[in-house]
Curated annotation (Swiss-Prot):
Keywords: Chloroplast, Cytochrome c-type biogenesis, Membrane, Plastid, Thylakoid, Transmembrane, Transmembrane helix. It holds the Pfam family Cytochrom_C_asm. It comes from Chloranthus spicatus (Chulantree). This is Cytochrome c biogenesis protein CcsA. May interact with Ccs1. Belongs to the CcmF/CycK/Ccl1/NrfE/CcsA family.
Length: 322
């Protein structure tokens, strides 16, 4: 009872901290202040420890590792986002992932706390299929992989947006030059008059292009490494799940909806990893594959639960709300 009360308190504390961090993030969009950024980072650290305490207290009073239903898996997913957010800070690197990981942690935990029915927050007795030592290994690896792959996919989407905008800018400049070539007589004087202004702008434009190149390179660098980490977790999760399935159901693979979409997810990111071996396919081309993976992950994790069918139906909305 004490730990159940502690979980309830930590849930509300965590949600309150999340609201504060969201407010700070919105302010930083308007005001670039280092102090506000540091405050939001401290808020994320506090959120991480609150979620950790929440998971531990639920583990103690429920008597099993808290990964048995949708509510618990969402808490663990937000904790996984927070872990990824903390990695650059632990290694004393600039936190290039905070733009993705912080909102992901905030919105996932916020939805878990306020978006699900209160009945879904209650701990239930494990179904027989989940009463195994493989629960912690398989489900934790899968959720860590989802968190890493979602973050990497979002970085790839950001890369595509920046690249797409760059292509539009180049196209607009090309059209301007094309039109100008047909009105040389009228524009010759204006071009001479504007040449000095163009020279003054040249340094600024080259700096902006260099900054954009650095940004896209950084996005490509981090998306590849985060997705590679997630792909490793996904592979371990699928293999451990196959061993567990053989123990529980007598077969390594049964092609139920969850397993099928897990295989599709693995295939998509295997293709992504293959594109990274070819330099001509790196950058925007591989980012397109990763962006497709973003939707596939949500179908695998969340969409299949809406069906409530198959061997993995114990994590569906229907069963957890009864």
């Amino acid at each position: 009872m004490i730990f159940a009360t502690l979980e309830h308190i930590l849930t509300h504390i965590c949600f309150s901290i999340i609201l504060i961090v969201i407010t700070i993030h919105l302010i930083t969009l308007l005001v670039h202040e280092i102090g506000l950024y540091n405050l939001s980072e401290k808020g994320m650290i506090a959120t991480f420890f609150c979620i950790t305490g929440l998971l531990v207290s639920r583990w103690i009073y429920s008597g099993h590792f808290p990964l048995s239903d949708l509510y618990e898996s969402l808490i663990f997913l937000s904790w996984s986002f927070a872990i990824i957010h903390m990695v650059p800070k632990i290694r004393n690197h600039p936190n290039s992932l905070s733009t993705i990981t912080a909102p992901s942690t905030i919105f996932t935990q916020g939805f878990t706390t306020s978006g699900l029915l209160t009945k879904m927050h209650q701990s239930t007795i494990l179904v027989p299929a989940l009463q195994s030592k493989w629960l912690m290994m398989h489900v934790s690896m899968m959720l860590l992989s989802y968190a890493a792959l979602l973050c990497g996919s979002l970085l790839s989407i950001a890369l595509l947006v920046i690249t797409f905008r760059k292509n539009i800018d180049i196209l607009g400049k090309s059209n301007h030059l094309f039109i100008g070539s047909f009105s040389f007589g009228k524009t010759q004087y204006l071009n001479e008059k504007r040449s000095l202004l163009h020279l003054q702008k040249a340094s600024f434009l080259s700096f902006r292009n260099y900054h954009r190149y650095q940004l896209t390179h950084r996005l490509d660098y981090w998306s590849y490494r985060v997705i590679s980490l997630g792909f490793t977790f996904l592979t371990i999760g699928i293999l451990s799940g196959a061993v567990w399935a053989n123990e529980a159901w007598g077969s390594y693979w049964n092609w139920d909806p969850k397993e099928t979409w897990a295989f599709i997810t693995w295939t998509i990111f295997a293709i992504y990893s293959h594109t990274r071996t070819n330099k001509s396919l790196q950058g925007a081309n591989s980012a397109i594959v990763a962006s497709m993976g973003f939707l596939i992950i949500w179908i695998c994790y969340f969409g299949v639960n809406l069906l409530g069918i198959g061997l993995h139906s114990y994590g569906s909305f229907t069963l957890t709300s009864n």
